[in-house]
Amino acid sequence: ALNEADGSNKSAISKYIETTYGELPDETVLGSHLNKMKESGELAFKQNNYMKADPNAPPKRGRGRPPKPKVPLPPGTVVSPPRPRGRPPKDPNAPPKSPKAKATPATGRPRGRPKKVARSPAVPSPTAVSTGRPRGRPPKVKPQLTEVSVES
């Protein structure tokens, strides 16, 4: 199917697979496999046709920025192995750590919000105002009506 000069489309490839190998599982499976082969460079895609990629063509560049070229080390340099990943394991033979003593704060105050101090009931709060005025906003003063006589 792919040996034609101008390539083969998806339907021709599926017909070829059905005649050669029998039943196809699904059209989408074939499409996804063709896309994978196209992305990896095994197949070339041109005008809705898939064709075998040229074996002499240079490999496709990967996505993103290429890595920096490594500078060769001078001869005689010993390269240490890279550090292992993750947290190092605990030493089972190490003595147990002593518990830390709690450090008292420098100010001498306890942490958090202070406790509510209860007031002694000996000093009653004044309930009535000594001036005799009622609480709140004073009422609006209404002007007094005067009788006006109309003489004719």
Curated annotation (Swiss-Prot):
Protein's cellular compartments: Nucleus
GO cellular component, one term: nucleolus
GO molecular function: double-stranded DNA binding; methyltransferase activity; nucleosomal DNA binding
Origin superkingdom: Eukaryota
Residues within the DNA-binding region(s): 60-68, 82-90, 108-116, 132-140
Keywords of this entry: DNA-binding, Nucleus, Repeat
Predominant localisation class: nucleus
Keyword Transmembrane in annotation: no
Annotated spans, Disordered: 40-152
Keyword Repeat attached: yes
Signal peptide coordinates: none
BP-aspect Gene Ontology terms: chromosome condensation; negative regulation of DNA recombination; nucleosome assembly; regulation of DNA-templated transcription
Start and end residues of each H15 domain: 1-54
Family membership noted in the UniProt record: Belongs to the HMGA family.
Name assigned to this protein: HMG-Y-related protein B
Organism annotation: Glycine max (Soybean)
